[in-house]
């Protein structure tokens, strides 16, 4: 019953037993029983009672399941005994703890001086630290600073050693993170009570009674002193807390050294004894990582704000999630987001854990795990993962899918290499590798360029992932059902009947990702060479020309790129193009306006003839509308958006039928979904006006029967108000537009008289059209008039197995974060108003 291993602590090895006997003879330890030893190590030396979350002596004889009850009892009973502390006894116990710590083995590194306060609380590693750590303590393969002492002067490796030592202190404490969190809540409660009592005391002193000042307030309940609180606060610091603090200090040191270097008079040389680590990057920002020797013109206030937000885990992430996840689900719907299974001697992990995809923190340190299941990829919301002090020999490549990881520790394992997929961990702030026989190449990059440089190396040098096959083309029959699949669009065209070929045409819609938006900061998961505009532009050319589509509707095309690249290129392949830039180009100088993106339509000259064209920006067009009203929502939310639409009336040469082709790109921000609905309402209203003008000579022709295509990036889900409006003809009640007033548009429920349907609806839409780490969904569509056109073929999905190996596009095969949509349409024989060319 006295064996500490029964409490979840490692057994005391022969070496430790011999050390204990020597210490007993020297008077450094009390009675040599493991029970007495446990009491000395885990009792609060300040007060005689353990802090919240730490095991007391009575727990040795009780079930380990009583830990939670013991924690609640301590929190409920308060702190009445805090004043009964004996400072002399505290100092003696501190000395005992330090002796135990020095003789108890460890991770092969020295504990820093700041751990003295932690030791006084009892948060020290047990004497019975696993034997394998002692065996490897002097192994230079696991601790490279033993082989290369210069690493001890490297700030990045010093941080590794410091945090490895902090991690080693948690050994022997089951659920250490949960216990530390309980201590934080305990301190917060105590501080709140103190503040409340002080406020009440001041209020009673200030309010006079009928016979002068009121009676003196009763003395507050016994509270821990500031000295005691500071020690408990130090003990409650988790490994993550220490990491944040250390990273902040490193950032401050780097900033101070740069400032001092700038202020140094010209001609003064740096003393030889002073190290200027200007070439040593820190995990601050990609800019600092890649351009460590460049000029730093950042404002100090902005830098501080960036530092504060970069190292936090939940506060800023909640805001980010709300920005990119406009669905009904909320981050706070889940009451807990952390799972602490630390120091429980677990050998295997239940598969059910990986169903908890809401987890942001997972603590598996101090166990006996030999492998981590590939299902870890399901936990894509993880910010913190601690695998330290296990028996892992490798890390799964699937862990690279946890792209939101900020703090990842695997101290003291037997991992020799890192998967290339770790290049996806673009948000990583710290990677704890000390105590592993890691490849020297990776260690060299880590110590020279920090974790960011290591991640970028893995990202940029990842071996090519072959695409098993191109996207297949799905043939659709006259009933709107999939009939057959072809390996390519060209193969499908070869099997197309001659009479059907005369009545059909193909259209491609593609958001090409403007080069001004494809920044390294926004797409950190994309290899730098694959993100370069020269590479992406060449891949876009190959992709677009390979489909040989009759109509090309492109979004996010820069004005200059349209004029100098796409027009000359596509002209050689028989295309004519029309372009319309976003509205802000009108207010800019000619040179700057060339950098503004917009929408364009290219058509094959042997397939189509241009009859007329029109273009609009939604805000400007609505202000000219005869029923325009200056509502508050329009002025504050919609008027400053510069999105546009382009309209072309074309005649299909083989069949003689006419068609309106429209392309647009709606506003992106999910916080303005009501504005997107308004923009679509304006687009459809304008299109109806154009159709009525064209058919004014023929009152019998219904505008529903006029062939219409509307292609583009609508930035809207299938369950959005935009989709409902286009698909059903109106939006009566939808949460995205509730309470918003856009005047006439809102009064008529944004209704229109066209019969439109999504072309991909016949196959249930694609799995996604936009693929990024934080967002993967369908937001691009090709809408067609159901009374005049019929879908006869669709370009299918990207191979799912290939997609599963990435966290987002662009990459070496797909040059945009969107994928192109392609459909074949047939003019229906019921279409009227046709005229042979």
From Swiss-Prot:
Coiled coil: none annotated. GO terms for molecular function: 3'-5'-RNA exonuclease activity; metal ion binding; poly(A)-specific ribonuclease activity; RNA binding. It is an enzyme of class 3 (hydrolase). LRR repeats lie at residues 334-356, 358-379, 381-402, 404-426, 427-447. The modification Phosphothreonine is found at residues 33, 285. It is found in: Cytoplasm; Nucleus. Changing residue 780 to A: Reduces activity. It catalyses: Exonucleolytic cleavage of poly(A) to 5'-AMP. InterPro entries: CCR4/nocturin_mRNA_transcr, Endo/exonu/phosph_ase_sf, Endo/exonuclease/phosphatase, Leu-rich_rpt, Leu-rich_rpt_typical-subtyp, LRR_dom_sf. Residues 15-24, 81-102, 197-209 have a biased composition (Low complexity). Its main location: cytoplasm. Residues 210-222 have a biased composition (Pro residues). The keyword Metal-binding applies. The keyword Nucleus applies. Changing residue 713 to A: Strongly reduces activity. GO terms for biological process: DNA replication; DNA replication checkpoint signaling; nuclear-transcribed mRNA catabolic process, deadenylation-dependent decay; nuclear-transcribed mRNA poly(A) tail shortening; positive regulation of transcription elongation by RNA polymerase II; regulation of transcription by RNA polymerase II; transcription elongation by RNA polymerase II; traversing start control point of mitotic cell cycle. Gene3D superfamilies: Endonuclease/exonuclease/phosphatase, Ribonuclease Inhibitor. The modification Phosphoserine is found at residue 278. Residues 55-66 have a biased composition (Polar residues). Residues 1-32, 46-66, 81-107, 197-223, 254-281 are annotated as: Disordered. Belongs to the CCR4/nocturin family. The 169 C-terminal residues are important for deadenylase activity. Subunit of the 1.0 MDa CCR4-NOT core complex that contains CCR4, CAF1, NOT1, NOT2, NOT3, NOT4, NOT5, CAF40 and CAF130. In the complex interacts with NOT1. The core complex probably is part of a less characterized 1.9 MDa CCR4-NOT complex. Present with 2780 molecules/cell in log phase SD medium. This is CCR4-Not complex 3'-5'-exoribonuclease subunit Ccr4.
